[in-house]
Each structure stands twice: as structure tokens, then as C-alpha cells.
Amino acid sequence: MTFRTLPIRAAAVAAGLAVATPALAQNASFFVVHGIPGRDVAATADPLLPVDVLVAGKYCLLAGFTFGSVAGPFDVPAGSYSVAISLANPIAPCTNTAVITATATLTAGEFGSIVAAESTSGAPTAEIYPVDVTSIAAGKQRIITSHAADAPEVKVTAIGSNPKEKAEFKLQPGKQNESTVDTAQKFSISATPVGAKGTIGPITVEAGDRSDILVWAVGNAANGSVTLLSKVLPDVY
């Protein structure tokens, strides 16, 4: 699949990757999402499960990156990049053996998210989800929800400040939904496993007009760790 306040280290790495590109139009952009809680790995693991993210075999993009965090967006030249995720090494970041590897193919002008998550078999993996950055009309917002959890189909509900500002849909594992809604200053977003009791969330997301509201479902249903993460991409004109 193809797709598009940084820490000083990450900003420097992104700048290094961008050296070869003569024009921004040839770039792609992406977020990195940490969606694996430590308790899904081992009972004794750090709940935040800090990891390091190495790109292209030599750029340590993120060090000590913790569960629930969303980093970026990063702008890089279009192309294919290896991504290696390892348990964090605070002394020598990005030098531990990779526990997740993936290849991200970035096409010029595209935007996306690389999500460290659990597959439906429970194994750690890196999934790539596109982010729609086409123009949004005035008075509208776009909610883009990605099901990256080791969990069954869920019913997602997003309710704005006014009950008329609402989106509701079902989402299969590994799939994505895009809903355009009337602008609300604040949305309450929750998910319910289809055919099961209990609600995931809600989380509260604040966003301005013409914003992309990005939501990722991550975690493991069997361990009771499924949660919702979010990021706002403002001013999508």
C-alpha cells in the first residue's frame, strides 16, 4: 500500500532524508503511531513499551517512542523505505535487534500513517494506512478511522457538540472508514465490538473547521487492551 512540535532528533532525521529532494511537491508525508501496549507483550513489560524507529537502515527517526504516541507528520522524498522497530536502547538508540520490520512505499504528494500494532494473530506488525488530504469544504470536517487492533468488527460512533453532528459506522479489522461531518468544536468518539458488551473509549477530540480527525483503534481484545488514539490534521484546504 502506498501513502503521505517534532523532537529535535526526529526533525534532524527528516531533514537528512529530505536533502536529496529539489522540490516539496516530490515529497510524501507520514505519521508514526505506537499502538502496542506493553502488557500485550509480557506481564512484566513496561506498559508504555518504549521503542526506537530506524528508517532506511541508518536514520534513527524516533528514540524511546511510547505506546499511545503519534509522531509527525514527517516530510521525506518519495520512494521506498525500510522501517525497523526495536525495543528502546536509551544508551545507543536504534541498535537493538528489530522486532518489527516493514517496507513503506511513499508516492509523491501522498500522506499516510505507519502504525505499529497487533495483527489478528496477535503478532506485532507495522500496518500502513492512507490519509486523505484532499480539500475539505468550509463548515465540514473529515473523520478517518483505521481499525488496527487485534479485535473483531467494531461499531464506531462520533458525536459532536450538537447531536446532529454525528457519524456512525461498522469497521472490520485492517479496514478504514472516512466520514465527512458538519464542523463541531468537539467530538466524543467511541467503539463497541459488534455482538459484544462493553465500550472502547470514549475519547474527546477537539478540532477546527476543515480538519482531518484521524482515529486508530489499537490493542488486543483478548487482553482487554483495545483503545482509541487520535491526531488532528488542521486546515485541509
Question: Predicted segment positions?
Answer:
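Bacterial N-terminal signal peptides that target proteins for export
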Residues: 2-11
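Intrinsically disordered, low-complexity polar regions and short flexible loop motifs
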Residues: 24-237
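...the same signal can extend to comparable exposed beta-sheet modules
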Residues: 1-2, 189
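Cleavable N-terminal signal peptides
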Residues: 12-13, 23
